[in-house]
Amino acid sequence: MNLLPGPEQLEIVAAAGEFLAERLPVERIRANRHAETPVPEALWRECAELGLLTLGLDEESGGSGRSIDDEVLLFIELGKRLASGPFLACTLAARVAARCGDAALSERIGSGAATVALAVLRGDGDVRPIKGTFDLFEPAGALHALVVAREGTALVDIASFGPLTAVAAADPGIRMCSATVESAEPLHWLPAEDERIWERATVLAAAYLTGLAAAAAALATQHAKTREQFGKPIGVHQAIKHACVDMELAASAAQAQTLFAAIALAGGRVDALLQVLSAVTVAGSAAVDNAAAGIQVFGGMGYTFENDVHLYLKRAHVFRHLFGEPTDVLAELLAQDRAQ
């Protein structure tokens, strides 16, 4: 099986990467850290016009109709560029709205006219009806929230969450709130029997984590090549070069596993869940470990606010916990492996 991207896929990724580098550079995260939203409305519409939210949406629903492995490559690029904003929530929400027959809402989300917050259940609760305590990501300006669960996915009127309590996120590129819901009915409900959105969401989160891992490795390697001590690049030392190689290998393994998980999910393989859990486990570890190792390669500079590498570590911790605690995911992965 060839897991290498083809020429057309590389063109899509290159176009997205150029746009993100120019319009959403990493420097914006620090500059806009006190803004209500990480991405201004006009810029968000530009992202939508480029097709960043609808790459995998059916053409009849206004999307590009590309496969999930193309979406994976896009989300890897989003991770590499440390792209802020509700890319994951809006990509999934446009799909859920279309599958539930709400073409108007799907079009508004896909065009960037409406944004959707991602609501993550913390602790005990339920998704139908909606009840429990939730963390909401990028709720400012959103009219709806997306709740992704194993049994199905809900699009919910964000007013159903009641008063939102602001949460200070460690990542300056993310806006968070928390809310406790007694009971609320979703606007749209897409059961897992109709489409496995939880698995799709987990694969795309793994792809973003893969991008973070790759970017952290690239930053550290470039620094090791150019930073000199005693007249030599620090990369000549085995402790540094071995760390950089390990980081590159971890990022490559994460990309291969995530692409394979996407193919397994799209093909309806019996081991699709195993592959999805493997992807988010491998990618999550690669992202966190690479960013942490990158800070060490940068030395004292890696701990400063002006350096980018710590931003990758903070974002990795957020995405790693979106659709399941890592220890729970690992336990289920081991159980799945024994059952194969």
Predicted regions and their residues:
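Alpha-helical interface subdomain recognition
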Residues: M1-R81, T202-Q340
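N-terminal glycine-rich flavin-associated loop
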Residues: G85-G101
